[in-house]
């Protein structure tokens, strides 16, 4: 279906929401995230364990250094031109962001759903840490050459108050760079600052989950590509397999159309009662 048709459906949905903001968009929708939350009953064990009750902090591409955080985010631990490759400044102000959780001024070239975790598998661009081979579960099946990260771009699921968001690992932090016992094991975060912060979340992740103020403890775990459900984290980025592969792009559009149709039908049913 054409982009014009999708835009008409979106406009119809917006009008419906303005008329009745309490509408449930997708009741029992199969497209909702299926990644297991730590409090849900499971029919199978997830491939990676949950890290529970972890303090989250926030960061963004292009963030300037501060007294508490002297490192700028124009570059990441794995991308010396992160801001340029992203396409610009990932403005964290919610007023300057769109409904699909991206910065309003441009379409990002990389996935706006990103996180940082406190482990770097590289010493530099020519050498991989010795510990990486020992502690990273997927190392043997993804390693290509010395100095090339096997962590960069890895998918993560974040759970907050019953809602799950997916994002890609894009940088190292907060505060630590070698906390493998926490990132890949069962230990608590080594960092003492910010209430033992153990994960950095991008503005897109923050806004999707609705994290505000000091109520910022979440759960997270690694996820395989095959586990990643439909969601806004599939839409953007040349580093995103769902956005860069035609079959995933097509499937994402079809899912979006189906969700909009279901929302319209749900509203019509409610209106006829």
Model-based region annotation:
Residues 28-273:
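Secreted/periplasmic proteins
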């Amino acid at each position: 279906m054409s982009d014009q048709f999708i835009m008409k459906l979106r406009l119809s949905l917006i009008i419906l929401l303005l008329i009745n903001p309490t509408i449930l968009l997708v009741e029992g929708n199969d497209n909702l995230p299926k990644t297991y939350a730590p409090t849900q009953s499971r029919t199978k064990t997830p491939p990676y364990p949950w890290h529970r009750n972890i303090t989250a902090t926030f960061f963004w591409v292009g963030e300037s250094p501060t007294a508490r955080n002297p490192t700028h985010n124009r570059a990441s631990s794995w991308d010396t031109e992160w801001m340029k490759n992203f396409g610009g400044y990932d403005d964290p102000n919610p007023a300057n962001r769109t409904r699909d959780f991206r910065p309003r001024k441009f379409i990002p070239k990389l996935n706006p759903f990103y996180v940082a975790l406190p482990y770097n598998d590289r010493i530099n661009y020519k050498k991989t840490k010795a510990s990486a081979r020992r502690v990273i579960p997927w190392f043997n099946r993804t390693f290509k050459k010395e100095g090339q990260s096997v962590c960069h771009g890895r998918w993560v699921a974040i759970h907050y108050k019953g809602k799950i968001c997916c994002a890609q690992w894009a940088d190292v932090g907060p505060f630590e760079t070698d906390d493998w016992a926490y990132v890949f094991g069962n230990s608590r975060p080594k960092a003492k600052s910010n209430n033992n912060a153990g994960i950095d979340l991008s503005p897109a992740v923050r806004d999707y989950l609705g994290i505000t103020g000091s109520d910022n403890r979440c759960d997270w775990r690694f996820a395989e590509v095959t586990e990643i459900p439909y969601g806004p984290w599939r839409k953007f980025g040349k580093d995103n397999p769902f956005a860069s592969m035609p079959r995933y792009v097509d499937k994402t559009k079809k899912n979006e159309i189906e969700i909009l149709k279901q929302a319209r039908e749900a509203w019509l049913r409610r209106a006829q009662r």
